[in-house]
C-alpha cells in the first residue's frame, strides 16, 4: 500500500470529528510526568452523539526527558457508543521517536496495516483484541470491564481487580471511583494500572491514569484542563 493511500485512510478517521450532526465536542489536556519530571502534555479532542464517537490526539515529549528519549505521535479513532461506553472500530496512529523513524498504523475490521519503524514496505497483521488505550482508559465513563486492550498492534490482557468508591465532597468536580487493574503484555509481563474517575458537568471523566512499573517511578497522566 502506498504511503499517500495509508495517510488518506488515517484522515478518514479524523474527518468524522467535524461531521457528526449535533455532536458534543470536548477538549482535554493531561500533563504527563515520571516522578516529578514533566515529560509533556497529552492533548486530545472528543466528538460524540448518542450512538457514535471519535477522537484525535497528540503527544510530544519535552524538557529534560528529551536528552534520553524523544517521542511524538498523532492518533485518532472512531467507533460506537453502547450504553454510554465507547467501542472502537477504526484506529490510526503516526509516530516518530529517538529510536525509530516514521511508523504508521491503520486498524480496521479486517486487520491492521502498518509501516514498521524505518521500514519501506507496509505489512498486514490480524486485528488485536479489545479497544485502544485511549478509548479504554480515557473515554470510558466507568471502570473498563473488557478483557483486552491494544495499542493498535499488540493485545494486552486486562484484569479489573478492585473498584473503590470515593465519597465525594460538596465540590462539583471531584473523584468518584478508583479502578485498579493488572495488565499482561504480549511478552507475559505484568504491570499495575490505576484509573481515577471524577464527576464533571459533562458526566464522569478520567482524572488520572497511573502506570506502576516495578522498581521504576510511576508514569502519571493527570487531567490539566477540560472544556
Regions of interest found by a model, annotated:
Residues 1-8:
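Bacterial N-terminal signal peptides that target proteins for export
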Residues 12-13:
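Hydrophobic alpha-helical transmembrane segments of integral membrane proteins
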Residues 16-18:
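N-terminal signal peptide c-region/cleavage motif recognized by signal peptidases
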Residues 22-108, 143-227:
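Acidic, serine/threonine-rich low-complexity disordered tracts
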Residues 96-138:
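Hydrophobic, well-structured mid-protein blocks that either form specific transmembrane helices
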Amino acid at each position: 500500500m502506498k504511503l499517500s493511500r495509508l495517510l488518506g485512510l488515517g484522515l478518514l478517521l479524523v474527518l468524522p470529528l467535524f461531521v457528526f450532526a449535533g455532536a458534543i465536542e470536548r477538549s482535554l489536556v493531561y500533563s504527563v510526568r515520571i516522578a516529578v519530571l514533566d515529560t509533556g502534555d497529552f492533548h486530545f479532542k472528543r466528538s460524540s452523539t448518542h450512538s457514535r464517537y471519535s477522537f484525535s490526539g497528540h503527544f510530544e515529549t519535552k524538557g529534560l526527558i528529551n536528552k534520553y528519549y524523544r517521542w511524538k505521535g498523532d492518533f485518532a479513532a472512531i467507533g460506537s457508543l453502547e450504553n454510554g461506553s465507547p467501542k472502537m472500530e477504526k484506529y490510526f496512529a503516526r509516530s516518530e521517536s529517538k529510536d525509530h523513524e516514521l511508523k504508521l498504523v491503520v486498524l480496521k475490521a479486517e486487520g491492521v496495516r502498518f509501516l514498521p519503524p524505518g521500514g519501506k514496505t507496509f505489512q498486514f497483521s490480524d486485528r488485536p483484541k479489545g479497544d485502544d488505550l485511549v478509548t479504554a482508559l480515557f473515554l470510558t465513563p466507568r471502570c473498563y470491564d473488557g478483557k483486552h486492550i491494544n495499542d493498535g498492534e499488540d493485545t494486552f490482557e486486562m484484569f479489573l481487580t478492585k473498584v473503590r468508591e470515593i465519597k465525594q465532597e460538596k465540590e462539583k468536580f471531584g473523584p468518584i471511583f478508583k479502578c485498579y487493574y493488572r495488565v499482561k503484555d504480549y511478552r507475559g509481563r505484568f504491570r499495575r494500572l490505576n484509573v481515577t474517575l471524577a464527576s464533571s458537568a459533562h458526566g464522569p471523566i478520567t482524572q488520572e491514569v497511573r502506570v506502576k512499573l516495578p522498581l521504576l517511578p510511576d508514569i502519571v497522566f493527570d487531567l490539566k484542563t477540560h472544556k
